[in-house]
UniProtKB/Swiss-Prot annotation:
Keywords on record: Cell inner membrane, Cell membrane, Membrane, Transmembrane, Transmembrane helix
Function of the molecule: Plays a role in cell envelope biogenesis, maintenance of cell envelope integrity and membrane homeostasis.
NCBIfam families: ispZ (TIGR00997), PRK00259.1-1 (NF001323)
Protein name according to UniProt: Inner membrane-spanning protein YciB
Gene: yciB
Alphabetized InterPro entries for the sequence: YciB
Amino acid sequence: MEHPVFKRDPSEKSETERREVPPLLKLALELGPLLVFFFANARGEMLIERFPILGSIGAPIFLATALFMAATVIALAISWSMTRTLPIMPLVSGIVVLVFGALTLWLHNDTFIKMKPTIVNTLFGGILLGGLFFGKSLLGYVFDSAFRLDAEGWRKLTLRWALFFIFLAIVNEIVWRNFSTDTWVSFKVWGIMPITIVFTLLQMPLIQKHSLTDEENTAS
């Protein structure tokens, strides 16, 4: 029996199907923790001066990590309270944030939080490629997709996203290993998101080409 976090009870489908997070709020829930992370790292010293108790956490990157973890939990809680479900991608990402964030604070080593994007993107890329290897296009489960594509469309889109996730993992490794912490934080917030938006928009022709009509979807 599947846990309700991942799948709604069929008997409640008609009642809960309409429970959706408004697009702007969904964007805020996704970007909010990242913005908190960026602000806390950039203004960490100011926050510590104003609230001395925060100094016990450590340098700005550690304060940013702690607030990032808290903001992630709050975002997931808001999403759950509104929909009674948690999309698989934010859920897995949130779990990794908490695990690697805790290691960062416990060991006082920011390497762990810097590796978090690498781990998450490699995980999703590997899952998608593994699914394709076994003849399964798992992208719809990862993104909780609302659109419907034919089999060829799902295969192509899944492969593209798998390679994109791997690309993001490689880029993250290059940036955090070769640049300052401040540069890495800025790129994580202001670089990855625009790149992802552009990539997503570039997939629209493929999605439109392989989209199923209501009649085709019913027949399939």
